[in-house]
Amino acid sequence: MLRIYAPASSANISVGFDTLGAAISPIDGSLLGDVVQIESISTGFELESAGYFVRKLPKEPQKNIVYQAYVLFSEQLKLRGANVKPLRLTLEKNMPIGSGLGSSACSIVAALVALNQFHNEPFSKMELLEMMGELEGRISGSIHYDNVAPCYLGGVQFMVQSLGNICQKLPFFDNWYWVLAYPGIEVSTAEARAILPKSYTRQNVIAHGRHLGGFVHACHTHQENLAAIMMKDVIAEPYRESLLPNFAEVKQATRDLGALATGISGSGPTIFSIAPDLQTAIKLSSYLESHYLQNNEGFVHVCKVDNEGTREIK
């Protein structure tokens, strides 16, 4: 038996729409992500689901993304002249769906890594990553790697999709705390993408290029203040903030409390606030619990970047 944990991820990081993503884990050691367990059975294939958010999964097994991961993996394995072993997959769904924390990516990545390890790793990391992107595209409507790449590989990943590389790891600030607040409501990735305009003004394109270039430069030259200032979103946030509760007011309040930057995690409704120290992170956590959560499903976690990514757990 094998148990694989895939951590939550925060895509875009405000400044890098569809090009940046960070793997995130709570500092208290709790698992904010999905677990897939794989074990041998005598014949065939079985899929089971468990976990707090299991009730949010599709009722038909064929619509479960873990089932689709199994089908894609077996198809690719057949192209190599091999067949999948008889096995049972159990998805522990710990991540809320439509949260902006890479929920589907967690399930996809954990499932494919488990299947690959179970079959003695027939596929390379890049080959697995391509499969992950394809499955993610089936859910959101377009292939993108800004959740699956950091979830799988850890750290902050920059999508280059050139010279045989899908992504490259970006140096980052290990002293920063990420305060993640999920309000308990759902925003579908497809809906959040549909709300975006078909074209942008030249002014916005130039601003986006300046901010992203400045942010990447600041990460490589260890300039925290510049990196934080560059974390501006002219591509998605102005259009998506209407999907989030009191976003403008909450964003300003977090800045007043000392946040270096606040933005939408992925397509929302989770938001992130970057804190320079633990004391500020605790203040932000307390404020967001009181002012951003909408129901008992919501939560706030003080996190750091997870540099390990997807891994085997006991």
Curated annotation (Swiss-Prot):
It is an enzyme of class 2 (transferase). Pathway: Amino-acid biosynthesis; L-threonine biosynthesis; L-threonine from L-aspartate: step 4/5. Signal peptide: none annotated. The keyword Kinase applies. PANTHER family: HOMOSERINE KINASE, HOMOSERINE/4-DIPHOSPHOCYTIDYL-2-C-METHYL-D-ERYTHRITOL KINASE. Belongs to the GHMP kinase family. Homoserine kinase subfamily. This is Homoserine kinase. It comes from Haemophilus influenzae (strain ATCC 51907 / DSM 11121 / KW20 / Rd).
